[in-house]
């Protein structure tokens, strides 16, 4: 069942450190962008400080993936033009970046209504369980897994419907180095 109050399933400590590394950003620059001190950034990255309120909102915005209109245009076209049910989200915040028409039909919603909004609150129990496994699989780490296949059930939501079946998650980096997740629904025949 959908739990709208559930928090994003990411570790802001490791996410901030990874986002800074991928973008070549020093702690001092991140601190300046977030309106805090460099030691505060260091404490967040060590897990000693859990950001709340406006700092958390700014931090989520800083680490979120965004499709660049020119450099990521081909990827967006491939996703939106796909004949398969597929969508692309920020791997950190689960904000929708792009979706195919087939996915929109499954959801019974237009992607334009959801663009930039986090989809996490619509996650099925199986999707939540798969998300919890990612860190143990080395998701996003050098030498770790960058793809996961699992079976999901429905989410029980009329607001955004998840169809039971096989899902394939594939992690990729956008042109700015931010992590995105390609989510594809597949038939068993396709997966084998």
Language-model region placement:
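Short, basic/aromatic recognition patches
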Residues: 68-85
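DNA major-groove recognition helix of helix-turn-helix/homeodomain DNA-binding modules
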Residues: 50-72
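Short polybasic/polar patches that bind polyanions
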Residues: 21, 32, 61, 105
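Short alpha-helical DNA-recognition segment
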Residues: 24-42
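Sensory/regulatory domains in signal-transduction proteins
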Residues: 83-192
């Amino acid at each position: 069942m959908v739990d709208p109050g559930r928090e994003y399933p990411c570790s802001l400590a490791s996410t901030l450190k990874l986002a800074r590394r991928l973008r070549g950003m020093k702690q001092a620059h991140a601190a300046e962008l977030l309106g805090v001190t460099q030691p505060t950034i260091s404490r967040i990255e060590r897990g000693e400080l859990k950001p709340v309120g406006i700092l958390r909102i700014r931090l989520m915005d800083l680490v979120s993936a965004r499709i660049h209109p020119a450099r990521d245009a081909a990827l967006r076209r491939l996703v939106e033009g796909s004949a398969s049910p597929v969508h692309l989200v920020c791997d950190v915040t689960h904000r929708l970046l792009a979706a195919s028409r087939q996915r929109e039909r499954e959801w019974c919603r237009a992607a334009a209504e959801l663009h930039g909004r986090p989809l996490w609150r619509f996650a099925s129990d199986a999707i939540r369980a798969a998300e919890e496994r990612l860190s143990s699989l080395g998701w996003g780490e050098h030498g770790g897994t960058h793809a996961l296949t699992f079976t999901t059930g429905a989410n029980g939501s009329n607001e955004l419907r998840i169809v039971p079946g096989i899902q394939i998650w594939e992690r990729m980096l956008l042109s700015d180095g931010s992590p995105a997740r390609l989510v594809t629904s597949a038939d068993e025949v396709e997966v084998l």
